[in-house]
């Protein structure tokens, strides 16, 4: 299993309930196919640098997970099919990126406490 990180932007016209349903849908998609969720972050509503689909903002979410490559292809296909997703980007994490992500999560945890 490889280590991946996906950031996706949801349409800003969605209600809070619709956003939670969408995030839960994608999380369940991964876990039902044997993925191990490492981290899940809600970055909230953020202004974008440029308009996407005539929208100036979007709900940003980040998933960090371990999964097999063939499941990742199906996961990205689900993003493309869902109208609520405006953009997404998935990157494979190497050992340096994994350690950086762990430090970032620890720093976030210490600032929230």
Curated annotation (Swiss-Prot):
Any one annotated GO CC term: ribonucleoprotein complex
Annotated Gene3D superfamilies: 3.30.70.60
Keyword Ribosomal protein among record annotations: yes
NCBIfam families xrefs: S6
Domain of life according to the entry: Bacteria
Organism per entry: Flavobacterium johnsoniae (strain ATCC 17061 / DSM 2064 / JCM 8514 / BCRC 14874 / CCUG 350202 / NBRC 14942 / NCIMB 11054 / UW101) (Cytophaga johnsonae)
Function: Binds together with bS18 to 16S ribosomal RNA.
PANTHER family in the record: MITOCHONDRIAL 28S RIBOSOMAL PROTEIN S6, SMALL RIBOSOMAL SUBUNIT PROTEIN BS6M
The protein's name in its UniProt record: Small ribosomal subunit protein bS6
InterPro entries assigned: Ribosomal_bS6, Ribosomal_bS6_sf, Ribosomal_S6_plastid/chlpt, Transl_elong_EF1B/ribsomal_bS6
GO term, biological process aspect, one: translation
Molecular function, one GO term: small ribosomal subunit rRNA binding
Family assignment from sequence similarity: Belongs to the bacterial ribosomal protein bS6 family.
Sorted UniProt keywords: Ribonucleoprotein, Ribosomal protein, RNA-binding, rRNA-binding
